[in-house]
Amino acid sequence: MSATPVPFKLVVDLYNVLDGVTSVLPWGRPSNTVELDMGRMADVIAAKSNRPIRFDEITVHMGVCDPRRHPQRYATEQAMIRRWHRDPRVSVRSRPNRFNPETSTYEEKGVDTAIALDLCTSQASGRFDGVVLFSADADFVPALEQAYRAPGATVQLARWKGQPSRLWLPGEKLWCHYLDEDDLAQCSTPCTRWGIA
């Protein structure tokens, strides 16, 4: 008889996940050639766990572009969000990116703060047995330390196999789920149209 899966939450740092996916794609293939399914990605992570878990909530944090400046990219972002919302476990917390006219690029503003708050409040909420942060961004070390050491839900990490990261707590027994190319195949579909990465 198998044990009943315990409730977990997945906190996704979207652009870090998209940036890191290239570490499991064939060399030279950009991240905008695959479309990630957040629900299936959570299920892949749950299957890798050393105990039965289920993700009751999946929160995707992302910055979005200016719809007036880049309407096609904005439409692509909104279509992606609508697809993810087909899974009732998924919620998206988006914040407007700041456009830098000197570099013609966007910069995320407030997304990292929202992720850190989500990690810490979810860990302490009493609603989950565990919270998994899918990111390799070392800027989250202070929030990770707080959430990992606080009483309440266990905290774990997820990232792509081979994705460079300094997001770690030396000397601690912090569990990390490493997703490889086979895992990517289970939680993505090829994307033949213009992407956002």
What are these regions (language model features)?
Residues M1-E107, T154:
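Domain-level signal for Mg2+-assisted phosphodiester chemistry and nucleotide/NA-binding surfaces
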Residues R86-A197:
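Nuclease catalytic cores that cleave nucleic-acid phosphodiester bonds
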